[in-house]
């Protein structure tokens, strides 16, 4: 059984027991329980239920494993040819690691 759920603007295919990295969720602690109720599709062993836009009564219960994980550094390089202009910027995206405990459909 899997569901497609909208987590902070990203649609993810989720199954029970799966670990996910989602955009940083503020004000949560390790071990806290988080619910996501924007379920778009439910596949229960071949029986597919598609919401319009959401599936009624379906939700995903997750546990926060690591509240703040930083991703790899992304480098942004700007250059204007023949002018000697070069600029290097970068950032590290923040994520939250969660574990899917239960899928209620």
Swiss-Prot record:
A Pfam family per the record: Ribosomal_L21p
Source domain of life: Bacteria
A molecular function (GO) term: rRNA binding
Keyword Ribonucleoprotein carried by entry: yes
GO terms for cellular component: cytoplasm; ribonucleoprotein complex; ribosome
Keywords assigned: Ribonucleoprotein, Ribosomal protein, RNA-binding, rRNA-binding
Gene Ontology biological-process entries: translation
Assembly mode: Part of the 50S ribosomal subunit. Contacts protein L20.
Reported function: This protein binds to 23S rRNA in the presence of protein L20.
Similarity section: Belongs to the bacterial ribosomal protein bL21 family.
Protein name: Large ribosomal subunit protein bL21
